[in-house]
Amino acid sequence: MKDLDTNLQALLTGFRNAIGVPALLLFSAMIGFGSLAQEQGLSLYISILSTVLIWGMPGQVVHVELYGLGAPLIAVVLGVAGANARFMPMTLSMMPVFADSPHNRKWNYLISHFISINTWAEMLHRGHEIRADRRVSYFLGFSATCMFSGVIGVFQGYVLFESMPEMVSLCLIFLVPIYFGLITVSYTHLTLPTTPYV
C-alpha cells in the first residue's frame, strides 16, 4: 500500500478496508450495547454520546451499569477509566507507527482516542506497508468507519430493544472479547519492525 499518493486516497483505502469484518463486528456488538442502554434507562442521545466519547465496550458497559444503579458521577468516571485502562498499552505500542508522520505530535492525543481493538490490530499489521506521511489519513479513514458503524449499531439496538431477547444482546456484546482473543492469537506470529518506520 505504498502507492497511496494523496491523503484522500489513504483515507478512502482505510474506509474500504474497514468495511467488512471490523465494521460488522462493531455494528453487531453495539446493537447489544444499545439494547442494554435502553434497558437501563439511558436516552438515545446519551447512549450515542457515550459511544463516541468513551469508545470502548468495557467502559461503556460500566457506564451503563453504574448509571442504572444511580452511582455518583465520580464513581462512573473512575469505573470507566479503570475499565478502559487496557487502551494504555495498546496506545503505547501503536504510537511508533506514527513516529515518522509529518503531523504535529500534539495531534497524537486526539488520534489516540480513536484507537480500538480493530484499529490497533490493523495498524500494527499494515502500518509498515503504508508510507509514513499517509498513515494518519489511513488510520482516520479506518477508525471513522468503525466508529460510525458502532454508532449505527447503538441506534439499531436501542430502537429494537423491545423485540430483542436479552440473551441475544448479551451475546452480541460478548463478541468483542472473543474477537480480541482471535486477533491476538492470529497476530502472534508477526515480527514487528524493531527500527523506526520509514
Spans of model-derived segments:
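Helix-loop-helix hairpins and the membrane-proximal interhelical loops
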Residues: M1-I54, E65-L78
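Short juxtamembrane and helix-loop transition motifs at transmembrane-helix boundaries
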Residues: N7-G14, Q38-L44, G70-I74, H103, ...
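Hydrophobic alpha-helical segments embedded in the membrane of multi-pass proteins
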Residues: L26-S28, L170-I183
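Structural signature of hydrophobic alpha-helical transmembrane segments
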Residues: Y45-T51, V80, P165-V176
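Alpha-helical transmembrane segments and their helix-entry boundary regions
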Residues: S47-L49, V61, V76-V77, Y109, ...
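Helix-loop-helix junctions within the multi-pass membrane cores of secondary transporters/permeases
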Residues: L78-E166
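Single conserved hydrophobic/aromatic residue that forms the stacking wall/gate
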Residues: H189-V198
